[in-house]
Amino acid sequence: MQGPTLAVLGALLAVAVSLPTPAPRVTVYVDPPAYPMPRYNYTERWHTTGPIPSPFADGREQPVEVRYATSAAACDMLALIADPQVGRTLWEAVRRHARAYNATVIWYKIESGCARPLYYMEYTECEPRKHFGYCRYRTPPFWDSFLAGFAYPTDDELGLIMAAPARLVEGQYRRALYIDGTVAYTDFMVSLPAGDCWFSKLGAARGYTFGACFPARDYEQKKVLRLTYLTQYYPQEAHKAIVDYWFMRHGGVVPPYFEESKGYEPPPAADGGSPAPPGDDEAREDEGETEDGAAGREGNGGPPGPEGDGESQTPEANGGAEGEPKPGPSPDADRPEGWPSLEAITHPPPAPATPAAPDAVPVSVGIGIAAAAIACVAAAAAGAYFVYTRRRGAGPLPRKPKKLPAFGNVNYSALPG
């Protein structure tokens, strides 16, 4: 009996050893980083609220480059990087002897018939002979609060890094880069590997998700305002430090560098993984569906294209039932100790002081001063007239006797003549 029993136990032990060891779900201590300084000096301009441009303005005359982005494991980092040929654009500006340029970087998440604004940043009076983003003036970065908790811009502020993204992050992203009014679009198709990361800032399970989704009509009517639907966040240097700090505290390893995203080719769906997002052909087919975009979203038919019409889709509207994901708390909950809170850095600067108007003089005092001035002028005029009339009738004034030099000790005067 012992022989078969030992054989069975040995087989079970061998199977147990061959199984992968589950990753420990614990946090580790990491020295909190110091608040970083900006790479260069600039002036932060607080802009009043304004509309976010539509991401659906592309067409045949405006081609869109498409890239594919994924990560090796669920708890890894994901990079959305594509060279938009900014260096060539800036070199052309130098050849034109342009002293400066203006730029805007915007990120969207494209859904069925709508787009979610994720990130907005403006640059003014930029130096074309330096790297992109070296400018005299910049606005604060404006973020979707959910995405800001686990994502940050790359060092050149043109790419996007996500740390342990949740399953709901999959889909199509669009970057719009404006330089002196000319826009260049780049799409990123994000697909995640099988499995879920235990420390992801995920949506459905914990009730956090992206903000509202707006159809093309709302963008065209300038209803999507950046200060209404986006939140001001830390500068890029501090944003990177806080997300990396949170990622490393949960056992993550930040890569020393990130490779550029590959050209988009629909990958096969891995076992347990989500299928890749549709390509341009399916999107164009979707655009040709019924004009009633809202009905297309709610019915069993295929999703409409980005030009579909309808009301703005909030997370509650997308879910359609109570208990669906809702926007999460402030994304600075994981900031290192000693760092300024978002409330401390996101308040608008005080309005410029205007010189105060002088205190108004009471009416009675003003009347008294005016009366006194009139009396003084009248008295002076009366005195001058009195002297003039007296002298007019009296003739010329008598001459004073002319003194003559003394002769000896005798003084005398010249006779009047």
Curated annotation (Swiss-Prot):
<feature type="compositionally biased region" description="Acidic residues">
    <location>
        <begin position="279"/>
        <end position="292"/>
    </location>
</feature>
<feature type="topological domain" description="Intravirion">
    <location>
        <begin position="390"/>
        <end position="417"/>
    </location>
</feature>
<keyword id="KW-0732">Signal</keyword>
<keyword id="KW-1234">Viral attachment to host entry receptor</keyword>
<protein>
    <recommendedName>
        <fullName>Envelope glycoprotein D</fullName>
    </recommendedName>
</protein>
<feature type="disulfide bond">
    <location>
        <begin position="75"/>
        <end position="197"/>
    </location>
</feature>
<feature type="disulfide bond">
    <location>
        <begin position="126"/>
        <end position="135"/>
    </location>
</feature>
<keyword id="KW-1133">Transmembrane helix</keyword>
<feature type="signal peptide">
    <location>
        <begin position="1"/>
        <end position="18"/>
    </location>
</feature>
<keyword id="KW-0945">Host-virus interaction</keyword>
<dbReference type="GO" id="GO:0046718">
    <property type="term" value="P:symbiont entry into host cell"/>
</dbReference>
<keyword id="KW-1015">Disulfide bond</keyword>
<comment type="function">
    <text>Envelope glycoprotein that binds to host cell entry receptors, promoting the virus entry into host cells. May trigger fusion with host membrane, by recruiting the fusion machinery composed of gB and gH/gL.</text>
</comment>
<keyword id="KW-0472">Membrane</keyword>
<feature type="disulfide bond">
    <location>
        <begin position="114"/>
        <end position="213"/>
    </location>
</feature>
<feature type="glycosylation site" description="N-linked (GlcNAc...) asparagine; by host">
    <location>
        <position position="41"/>
    </location>
</feature>
<feature type="glycosylation site" description="N-linked (GlcNAc...) asparagine; by host">
    <location>
        <position position="102"/>
    </location>
</feature>
<dbReference type="GO" id="GO:0016020">
    <property type="term" value="C:membrane"/>
</dbReference>
<keyword id="KW-0946">Virion</keyword>
<dbReference type="GO" id="GO:0055036">
    <property type="term" value="C:virion membrane"/>
</dbReference>
<dbReference type="GO" id="GO:0098670">
    <property type="term" value="P:entry receptor-mediated virion attachment to host cell"/>
</dbReference>
<dbReference type="Pfam" id="PF01537">
    <property type="entry name" value="Herpes_glycop_D"/>
</dbReference>
<dbReference type="InterPro" id="IPR036179">
    <property type="entry name" value="Ig-like_dom_sf"/>
</dbReference>
<feature type="transmembrane region" description="Helical">
    <location>
        <begin position="361"/>
        <end position="389"/>
    </location>
</feature>
<feature type="region of interest" description="Disordered">
    <location>
        <begin position="259"/>
        <end position="356"/>
    </location>
</feature>
<keyword id="KW-1161">Viral attachment to host cell</keyword>
<comment type="similarity">
    <text>Belongs to the herpesviridae glycoprotein D family.</text>
</comment>
<keyword id="KW-1160">Virus entry into host cell</keyword>
<keyword id="KW-0812">Transmembrane</keyword>
<keyword id="KW-0325">Glycoprotein</keyword>
<dbReference type="InterPro" id="IPR002896">
    <property type="entry name" value="Herpes_glycop_dom"/>
</dbReference>
<keyword id="KW-0261">Viral envelope protein</keyword>
<feature type="topological domain" description="Virion surface">
    <location>
        <begin position="19"/>
        <end position="360"/>
    </location>
</feature>
<dbReference type="GO" id="GO:0019031">
    <property type="term" value="C:viral envelope"/>
</dbReference>
